[in-house]
Amino acid sequence: MYTPHPFGFLIILVPMTNAMRAIAAIAAGVGSVAATVATSTTSSISSSTTIINTSSATTIGGNHTSGSTGFSTNSTLLDADHLPLQLTTAKVDLDIEIDIQLLTNGYDGTTLTSFYNESSWTNASEMDTIVGEEPEPLSLVSIVVVGIFLSVLIFLSVAGNILVCLAIYTERSLRRIGNLFLASLAIADLFVASLVMTFAGVNDLLGYWIFGAQFCDTWVAFDVMCSTASILNLCAISMDRYIHIKDPLRYGRWVTRRVAVITIAAIWLLAAFVSFVPISLGIHRPDQPLIFEDNGKKYPTCALDLTPTYAVVSSCISFYFPCVVMIGIYCRLYCYAQKHVKSIKAVTRPGEVAEKQRYKSIRRPKNQPKKFKVRNLHTHSSPYHVSDHKAAVTVGVIMGVFLICWVPFFCVNITAAFCKTCIGGQTFKILTWLGYSNSAFNPIIYSIFNKEFRDAFKRILTMRNPWCCAQDVGNIHPRNSDRFITDYAAKNVVVMNSGRSSAELEQVSAI
């Protein structure tokens, strides 16, 4: 027969005392967690959420005495109505870990409090990363410096691209069909500067969006559309230069004004389809947008938070496919340029010059005037070809700068869609503004590498040729200009005589 121990009540009292100590330690830990979370997330949590239900003490003790592996539903949990979902989930997981430790090591109040505080700091830090909290706000000096830099960048972008459009409109030598694509590119960059960069600067400096939820979608759509139009215009420019250099005789028949206008319209329609259609349907981002909190106040954010499907599809259409085409075109242009240089060296060898002089003294009578000079007939370095190669170099530099500016962003854009915590917020903003800065670089490239644009910029800035006095672009066709006729004749002479020997060239010159 079982005989009760005379001090059996002490055996029961000791675990109950340890349990009460553990509850007190949990209460202190919960208070520390509440204070830490309130500080790190800059939100106020009601003091009532840190109160522990005293009636749960018996339940906790009973559960641990009976060997339960977790807290009951009435155990020490913060009020879920006042906490984010991530924090509530982390709290439940943390309770399970604490329960396991209590079962393993016993109820030691000091150890339990230390474990809870350390875990609460870790989970609070992880929660900040998962939820996507905004970083610490910039200081006043940083805001002023960044604001001045962004203002200068926006001004250069707007002014430079307006100059490009005015130069093409007012300068007769720039009113060529190929420059219509440059004008379309300048318009896209002008939209980026005026409609995208201005609102992006205000959003990044304030840390939240103040222009309304509806305009946020419109702004994001313009961002995607203008960037896509810029890339597709560069792809069209590279194709235009390739045809112009590779097959100049057929260029006038293939690339007409109508073809150029239709191509530009198709570029803008495709850019609008990629941007406005999915964004208006709301399939470009997750259902729950991020919320920025400051001193208990919630502010909406407007960021390029894309779904993985839309990020991959839009990036391929807007960037990767056109880039593959442009790189392939410029590789072919480079090979053709190398072959062209070799042909120039082969035609102008010193031995052939002596041979031409010898045939000239034998076959041509002295009293018969020359109609053409041999050195001008077979040379490939006519002004027509020189200007073509300068244009190709200019467009190549434009494409290179464009890739440097936008490749990092599009790589990060796809990565961020699949892994929200892999890319920091500041890194994403810096790479986004690096892409925006490309809109300011193109006019600078024109002024450095293209003398015609440089002279046109000078005339516009000095008001030597007011744009209001310029003739209509549609009334001046490139085929009707004197320069086009002269270059076309020189080009045909070069092509017809490029395969002839020196003796045949002397016979032609003697006619």
Curated annotation (Swiss-Prot):
Key words, A-Z: Cell membrane, Disulfide bond, G-protein coupled receptor, Glycoprotein, Lipoprotein, Membrane, Palmitate, Phosphoprotein, Receptor, Signal, Transducer, Transmembrane, Transmembrane helix
Function: Receptor for dopamine. The activity of this receptor is mediated by G proteins which activate adenylyl cyclase. Might be involved in the processing of visual information and/or visual learning. Important for Pavlovian conditioning: required in the mushroom body as a receptor conveying unconditional stimuli information, has a role in memory formation for aversive and appetitive learning.
Outcome of swapping residue 69 to I: In strain: Canton-S
Glycosylation positions in this chain: 53, 63, 74, 117, 123
Keyword Acyltransferase: no
One function term, GO molecular function aspect: dopamine neurotransmitter receptor activity
Transmembrane segments: 143-169, 180-206, 217-239, 259-279, 311-331, 392-412, 428-450
Keyword Phosphoprotein: yes
SUPFAM superfamilies: Family A G protein-coupled receptor-like (SSF81321)
Tissue specificity: Expressed in the larval and adult CNS in structures that mediate higher-order brain functions such as learning, memory and motor control: in the mushroom body neuropil and four unpaired neurons in each thoracic segment. The adult CNS has intense expression in the central complex, moderate expression in several neurosecretory cells, and weak expression in two unpaired neurons in the mesothoracic neuromere. Also seen in the somata of the optic lobes.
InterPro entries: Dopamine_rcpt, GPCR_Rhodpsn, GPCR_Rhodpsn_7TM
Miscellaneous comment: Potency of neurotransmitter agonists in stimulating cAMP production and the lack of stimulation by other transmitters and metabolites suggests this is a D1-like receptor. Low homology to vertebrate D1 receptors suggests this may be a progenitor of the D1 receptor subfamily.
Example of a GO cellular component annotation carried by this entry: dendrite
Membrane topology according to the record: Multi-pass membrane protein
Family stated for the protein in its record: Belongs to the G-protein coupled receptor 1 family.
Signal sequence bounds: 1-19
Extracellular topological domain residue ranges: 20-142, 207-216, 280-310, 413-427
Lipid addition sites, S-palmitoyl cysteine: 468-469
Consequence of gene loss (knockout): Simultaneous knockdown of Dop1R1 and myc restores the induced male-male courtship observed in the single myc knockdown.
A GO biological-process term: response to sucrose
Localization (cell): Cell membrane
Name of the protein: Dopamine receptor 1
Cytoplasmic side: 170-179, 240-258, 332-391, 451-511
Cysteine disulfide partners in this protein: 216-302
Lineage: Eukaryota, Metazoa, Ecdysozoa, Arthropoda, Hexapoda
UniProt main location, coarse: membrane
